[in-house]
Design a protein with these regions (language model features):
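HIT superfamily nucleotide-processing domains
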Residues: 1-130
Length: 130
């Protein structure tokens, strides 16, 4: 299946839709989940157009994971998180709802993890810890 360049994350990357950005460089964007499962729930996406993890070139995947670690450390520091849930759903059958590969960083323990919330989160503490 061809990459859908009209998906919400592609539109965010092009600046067509707003996002609360936590981190951005020439290869990756990290931003707050619009319906967070916990305070500090952050999404990390490569700028490479790839629908699933398996579509992402190895070099881009490796770099994205480096940024995932950087953001996870910032979340732990900023929010005094005792743990981070890293979640990557690859493909519709796995529950992926946006057809652009992305990584969820959720400060929580698996026992506290809930469904997406109804309020937007605050990114300023995480930004300050970077």
């Amino acid at each position: 299946m061809a990459y859908d360049d009209q998906n919400i994350f592609a539109r965010i990357l092009r600046g067509e839709l707003p996002a609360i950005k936590v981190y951005e460089d020439d290869q990756v964007l990290a931003f707050m989940d619009i319906m967070p499962q916990a305070d500090g729930h952050t999404l990390v996406i490569p700028k490479t157009p790839a629908e699933t993890l398996l579509d992402l070139p190895a070099e881009s995947a490796a770099y994205t994971i480096q940024v995932v670690q950087k953001i996870a450390r910032a979340i732990e520091t900023a929010l005094d998180a005792k743990g981070i849930v890293l979640m990557q759903l690859s493909g519709a059958a796995a529950g992926q709802t946006v057809p652009h590969v992305h990584f969820h960083l959720i400060p929580s323990s698996i026992h506290e993890l809930g469904k997406h919330g109804s309020q937007m989160g605050d990114q300023e503490k995480i930004k300050a810890a970077l």
